[in-house]
Amino acid sequence: MAAKLPHKGNKFKSYLPRKTSKFKFSKVSELEVFLLLEGMDKTKSFGLDKIHPFLLQSSAIEIYQPLTFIINLSLKTGVFPESLKIAKVIPIFKQGCRLLCNNYRPISILSALSKIFEKCVLNQITFYFILEGLFTDNQYGFRRGRTTTDCLVDLIEEITVALDQGEYALSIFLDLSKAFDTVNHSILLTKLIYYGIEDMENQWFDSYLHKRKQRVLVNGIFSDLLMINSGVPQGSILGPFLFLIYINDIEQATKEFSLRLFADDTSLTLTDKNLDLLIEKANAAFNPIYEWLCANISFP
């Protein structure tokens, strides 16, 4: 879908809120890093660096202090380590013809050390977004205490109430193909500034996103390194949260609809007693959403 949308330049800025607060990195404590190392999932696989989570967990007491120093240095200088930006991609066959690439689901595996860096940052940025109330209440995805069930119950309740009142209900469901891959890095970094993440903090996210690479592993053989020019990092800790930030302002284009989001899965609902009028209203109200998609969802 992204490839079919005409990009609208800098129009995406018109949907963004005015900046009212500012985010600054806090110094990461040695205790936080130690607990993250201790809590690593030993069953997870390792990345291209071949450092297994079990090894990190087992050596937590020896490495937590130097690792804390490196993480804080990364935040202070706005530089994410290049060696942690290379992913190992394993294609998993789904169904159909094995000769078609679309019939495989890519599993991206990053360095286990990268997860420690990212969790430290995620803890801070999550607290900031919650404290400042920056996320739309219509987002149910990747948020503590919210589930797909909550989203579905809310939708069913609205439709039930409408039917009880003798109204028709119309819902439009959007499913963006490979949505996490359609994130434009330049647009995302600009959005972070609008949400108060600027200066060295924005530079860190710039470093985190850019110049990422991947190697595909098939039958024990690795491909050459391939550059990744768009999207949030697959298999990462910060990726889903960054996508929520990216899509957060879509509510500015859906004021006529009742909006519900679960990450990229979007439902838009309208009700009216007159069916013909309802369809007419829905067609007209969808135009601003199309404009938002044109302004935001694209490959660079």
Protein language model regions, located:
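Inter-domain linker/hinge segments that demarcate the starts of reverse transcriptase
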Residues: 30-38, 66-73, 123-125, 151-162, ...
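Conserved catalytic palm subdomain of right-hand nucleotidyl-transferase polymerases, strongest
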Residues: 42-51, 100-109, 150-190
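Active-site palm subdomain of RNA-directed nucleic acid polymerases
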Residues: 121-139, 240-270
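Catalytic palm subdomain of template-directed nucleic-acid polymerases
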Residues: 179-195, 267-290
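Polymerase palm active-site segment centered on the conserved acidic dipeptide of motif C
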Residues: 197-203, 258-261, 275-300
